[in-house]
């Protein structure tokens, strides 16, 4: 209805219209959280790291990957976490046995350099480097999983997990996942003693890594509900 040129109505029709408007507003209010949640990125894969610090078990980190939003980046991480490509063939390299070489408290923990271990190495499953896929997802807070790089289109295998919101990294680093379980382990890693270059004094290693099944929910009609995380 054009409010600048109101349409003549009877009292009864006005009451009916008011009721409809009130009902519409109420429905929108009730459904709005669900709509926002439904727009969250779909988690297509779950992978885990079993972490050791100084040779002693520290705990497990479970991460969800956004394979619908950034399929190429998510598959790179999944393959490196499992050591197998999408066909189940061994890569001959990957994250297992590698270390977290850079820890900065109130910022992030960084790993993924399985060739040199100092932040200068690593490689992707697509070759040495691959381009930035997109910057649709943002660094919204603790637990965000994002690609480390040396500038535009230089993604390899190195990644970081945020321990705080890092909005200044938006549109510069590709977000591709989120920690689902084990943030206590991440915070424990964040607080270890470090030396020059933010390197842990005692090594933090990925003792084991792999993929976990996703348990999908089912709606009232028996349809599988996508596994999402609300950002």
Swiss-Prot record:
GO cellular component: endoplasmic reticulum lumen; fungal-type vacuole
E.C. code: 5.2.1.8
Main location: endoplasmic reticulum
Native organism taxonomy: Eukaryota, Fungi, Dikarya, Basidiomycota, Agaricomycotina
Name of the protein in question: Peptidyl-prolyl cis-trans isomerase B
A Pfam family annotated for this UniProt entry: Pro_isomerase
Gene Ontology annotations of biological process type: protein folding
Enzyme class, UniProt record, top EC level: isomerase
Motif Prevents secretion from ER, chain ranges: 228-231
Subcellular location: Endoplasmic reticulum lumen
Functional summary from the UniProt entry: PPIases accelerate the folding of proteins. It catalyzes the cis-trans isomerization of proline imidic peptide bonds in oligopeptides.
GO molecular function, one term: peptidyl-prolyl cis-trans isomerase activity
Positions bearing carbohydrate: 155
Family the entry assigns: Belongs to the cyclophilin-type PPIase family. PPIase B subfamily.
PPIase cyclophilin-type domain: residues covered: 48-211
Catalysis: reaction(s): [protein]-peptidylproline (omega=180) = [protein]-peptidylproline (omega=0)
Keyword Nucleotide-binding among UniProt keywords: no
Regulation: Inhibited by cyclosporin A (CsA).
Keywords recorded for this protein, A-Z: Endoplasmic reticulum, Glycoprotein, Isomerase, Rotamase, Signal
Signal peptide residues on this chain, from the entry's feature table: 1-35
């Amino acid at each position: 209805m054009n409010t600048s040129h109101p349409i003549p109505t009877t009292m009864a029709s006005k009451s009916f219209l008011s009721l409809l408007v009130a009902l519409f507003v109420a429905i929108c209010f009730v459904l709005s959280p669900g709509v926002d949640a439904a727009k969250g990125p779909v988690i297509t894969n779950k992978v885990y790291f079993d972490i050791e610090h100084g040779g002693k078990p520290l705990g497990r980190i479970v991460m969800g990957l956004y394979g619908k939003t950034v399929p190429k980046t998510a598959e790179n991480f999944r393959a490196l976490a499992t050591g197998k490509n999408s066909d189940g063939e061994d890569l001959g390299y990957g994250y297992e046995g590698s270390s977290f070489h850079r820890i900065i408290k109130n910022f992030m923990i960084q790993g993924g350099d399985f060739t040199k271990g100092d932040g200068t190495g690593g490689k992707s499953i697509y070759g040495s480097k691959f381009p930035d896929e997109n910057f649709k997802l943002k660094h919204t807070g603790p637990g965000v999983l994002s690609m480390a790089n040396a500038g535009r289109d230089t993604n390899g295998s190195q990644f970081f997990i945020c321990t705080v919101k890092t909005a200044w990294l938006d549109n510069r680093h590709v977000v591709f996942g989120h920690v689902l379980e084990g943030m206590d382990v991440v915070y424990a890693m964040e607080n270890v003693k470090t030396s020059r270059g933010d390197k842990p004094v005692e090594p933090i290693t990925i003792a084991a890594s792999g993929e976990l099944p996703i348990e999908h929910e089912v709606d009232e009609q028996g349809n599988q509900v996508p596994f999402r995380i609300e950002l």
